UniProtKB/Swiss-Prot annotation:
Catalytic activity: tRNA(Phe) + L-phenylalanine + ATP = L-phenylalanyl-tRNA(Phe) + AMP + diphosphate + H(+)
Gene Ontology biological-process entries: phenylalanyl-tRNA aminoacylation
Primary localization class, coarse: cytoplasm
Name of the gene this protein is made from: pheS
Cofactor: Mg(2+)
GO cellular component, one term: cytoplasm
Keywords of this entry: Aminoacyl-tRNA synthetase, ATP-binding, Cytoplasm, Ligase, Magnesium, Metal-binding, Nucleotide-binding, Protein biosynthesis
Protein name: Phenylalanine--tRNA ligase alpha subunit
Family: Belongs to the class-II aminoacyl-tRNA synthetase family. Phe-tRNA synthetase alpha subunit type 1 subfamily.
């Protein structure tokens, strides 16, 4: 039995050392140390030995089992390390190689138009003023010379949240808040108010229930309609170019008097009449006028000393005119096939 154990040990250790992968090593563990392996058979034969031989052979058998177990464990660590190193070698990334650059977005067409207009007005000395989109009824209507019985207060025209709060229908409330807190000792008011507004309109080619608006306000001493006309002329030439036909026509707004609307010839039909311009050949681009004395007085401004003008236009309409977009809904559908036509070189490609 002694010779049998020694032969078994030598044979097993040789095969363990020659094992080239973990599967082969595991097969050897089962072969030599498993329930049906030679070590188990030798242990079963211990009962046939004499009382004097049994302790010696039992101790030797345990030493062989321990030696084989340790040999397998040691070889397993070596093979596992080799497997990990081989995997790392095959999956190594060369960090010096150029990577795959992620796609970079660009500014949305509306954002481009709004920023272009903001830059233009800032260049004319205007400041940007902002206000809440959930507005008090007072600032949205009453402070702008729209009394409580005015049709614009009807529930079908506005999104009311409570009896006294609503989603603002225009950015004019920002003008009212600006006038209310302005100190004329620091100079006249000269602001633009960009932002989202909400009206219960039926969505079509030129209308949306949510859209953006930029309103302008100038209030100071000796501000006249000529100043308003000059501002609108600069706006038209800057945003639309000399080739665009423009007309100014009298209109009515509760918060301005006198009032005027500026129309631009339809980009789709060239003034002949189509569904975009509703057959008129013209698309309204903005409304404006001299600030109504009542609006000044509501903000505690002396209307006998100070005067001003205000105007408001939608960047969506400007975008449609400048870039020949025939349906306002294209600006909100997030279709990359449409958006990619107006990539901003300032921020990269989509």
């Amino acid at each position: 039995m002694l010779e049998q154990l020694q032969t078994l040990k030598n044979e097993a250790e040789t095969q363990i050392n020659e094992a080239s992968d973990l599967k082969t090593l595991n097969d050897l563990r089962v072969k030599y140390l498993g329930k049906k392996g030679p070590m188990t058979e030798i242990m079963k034969q211990m009962g046939k030995l004499s009382a004097e031989e049994r302790p010696k052979m039992g101790s030797l058998a345990n030493e062989v089992r321990t030696a084989l177990t340790e040999a397998i464990s040691s070889k397993q660590q070596i093979l596992e390390t080799e497997a990990i190193n081989e995997k790392l070698k095959s999956e190594t990334i060369d960090v010096t190689l150029p990577g795959t650059a992620p796609s970079i977005g660009t500014k949305h067409l509306l954002t481009q138009v709004i920023e272009e207009m903001e830059d233009m007005f800032i260049g004319m000395g205007y400041e940007i003023a902002e206000g809440p989109e959930v507005e008090l009824d007072y600032y949205n209507f009453e402070a702008l010379n729209l009394p409580k019985d005015h049709p614009a207060r009807d529930m079908q025209d506005s999104f009311y949240i409570t009896e006294n709060t609503l989603l603002r229908t225009q950015t004019s409330p920002v003008q009212a808040r600006t006038m209310e807190k302005h100190d004329f000792s620091k100079g006249p008011i000269k602001v633009i108010c960009p932002g989202k507004v909400y009206r219960r309109d039926n969505d079509d080619a030129t209308h949306s229930h949510q859209f953006t608006q930029i309103e302008g306000l100038v209030v100071g001493e000796n501000i006249t309609f000529a100043d308003l006309k000059g501002t609108l002329t600069v706006l038209a030439k800057t945003m639309f170019g000399e080739e665009r036909e423009i007309r100014l026509r009298p209109s009515f707004f509760p918060f301005t008097e006198p009032s005027v609307e500026m129309d631009i010839s339809c980009f789709k039909c060239g003034g002949k009449g189509c569904r975009v311009c509703k057959g008129t050949g013209w698309i309204e681009i903005l409304g404006s006028g001299m600030v109504h004395p009542n609006v000044l007085e509501m903000s505690r401004i002396d209307s006998t000393r100070y005067s001003g003008f205000a105007f408001g236009l939608g960047p969506e309409r400007v975008a449609m005119l400048k870039y020949a977009v025939d349906d306002i809904r294209h600006l909100y559908t997030n279709d990359l096939r449409f958006t990619k036509q107006f990539q901003s070189t300032e921020t990269g490609e989509i």
